[in-house]
């Protein structure tokens, strides 16, 4: 019996595939211990980032149906 492909559930919650084939991700360090971080630092952590090309294969392997 063939192995059933499944998405990595942790990766499915963290990455979204874009129309051009890349993956969006949220930046880290914005969940807790925010009082010591400056407003400027928190502002720069807000926008979504793209997954680096070196990690693209790893993420796409974890999300076979994305």
UniProtKB/Swiss-Prot annotation:
Pfam family, one: Ribosomal_L35p
InterPro entries reported for this sequence: Ribosomal_bL35, Ribosomal_bL35-like, Ribosomal_bL35_CS, Ribosomal_bL35_sf
GO molecular function, one term: structural constituent of ribosome
Region (Disordered): 1-22
Keyword entries, A-Z: Ribonucleoprotein, Ribosomal protein
One GO term (biological process): translation
Superkingdom as given in the UniProt entry: Bacteria
CC annotations in GO: cytosolic large ribosomal subunit
Entries under NCBIfam families matching the protein: rpmI_bact (TIGR00001)
Family as reported in the entry's similarity comment: Belongs to the bacterial ribosomal protein bL35 family.
PANTHER family associated with the record: 54S RIBOSOMAL PROTEIN BL35M, LARGE RIBOSOMAL SUBUNIT PROTEIN BL35M
Protein name per Swiss-Prot or TrEMBL: Large ribosomal subunit protein bL35
Species of origin: Pseudoalteromonas translucida (strain TAC 125)
Gene field: rpmI
């Amino acid at each position: 019996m063939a192995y059933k492909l499944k998405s990595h559930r942790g990766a499915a919650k963290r990455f979204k595939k874009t129309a051009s084939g890349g993956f969006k991700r949220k930046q880290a360090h914005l969940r807790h211990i925010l009082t010591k971080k400056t407003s400027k630092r928190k502002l720069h952590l807000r926008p979504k980032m793209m997954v680096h090309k070196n990690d693209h294969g790893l993420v796409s392997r974890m999300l076979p149906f994305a």
